[in-house]
Each structure stands twice: as C-alpha cells, then as structure tokens.
Amino acid sequence: MIMSNMTATQHLEIIREKNRPTVNDYIPAIFNHFTELHGDRHYGDDAAILSGIATLNSTPVTVIAQVKGRNLEENKKSNFSMPHPEGYRKALRLAYQAEKFHRPVICFVDTPGAFCGVEAEKRGQGEAIAKNIAEFMTLKTPVISVVLGEGGSGGALALAVCD
C-alpha cells in the first residue's frame, strides 16, 4: 500500500500494530552500554518513560523514550505509553543532567498523549508538560527527537522539542 494514498485511520492502524519495533528494540540496536536511570526525585518513577545513559559510537548520550508495549501486560506496565507527571519530571531531570555533563539528548516519542486521570492532574500533569516544553527549548546541549509512532497531544510535545 502506498503511504500517500492511505487514510488517517490506515496510518493509525500501522503505527499501532503490536508487532512493530518499539524503544525496547531500538535502544539495544542503536546504543551500547545503556544504563537505565529511575525516578523524578519528587514523587516516584514512571514506567511509561524509559531513560538513561548510553554510548553511541563511543559518545556518551542521554536517552529518553516513551515506552509502548506489545501485549496487554506490557501496555499495563507502561500505562499504555501515557506518561504521568513523574515521567515528564524524570525526563527533565535527565535532560538537565545531560546538559551539565555535556551529553546530547536523544528522545524517542511514541504516545497517544499524556495520562489524563484525576491523580495525574492532582500531581501537576499540565505543569510538568509545560515545563518540559519550555525547558527543552533552552537546553544548551543538542537534542534530537525521533517520532517512532504516535505523537499525540502535549504528551508527545514534551519530548519532541528539539534542535
């Protein structure tokens, strides 16, 4: 099927295909020595955001990725790739760390959007997304963002601001 002749629904079906590659495939294929880092140092960790330090052609980099599962169990663990505020705060913490140590940031975006539950709103979902967007625009380290599949709403924009 030629991509330009596809409807929006057909495009969505392709990017939601359960057997397509995810960050769990791309990270080990692209990077060496990936070490995952956890938590926002405020509330907790969020399995919808995978972040850490790796090497790319012997260059240290910071990797921040939205996680999408392949089955119900994996999707439940990653909240169906809908990050909570602590996920966005974790991403920003790692971006600040990358800037401090002069590491480029590589983000992988794949989300239908941020989690919109009451608890996420109580923990400052809107503020966390807005702060990520604003702060990523001022980082003094290179930022690359790759959209792997879905890029819905502010939940995607929070990791899509790049050079």
Q: What are the language-model segments listed below?
A:
Residues 1-150, 154-157, 161-163:
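Terminal-region recognition feature
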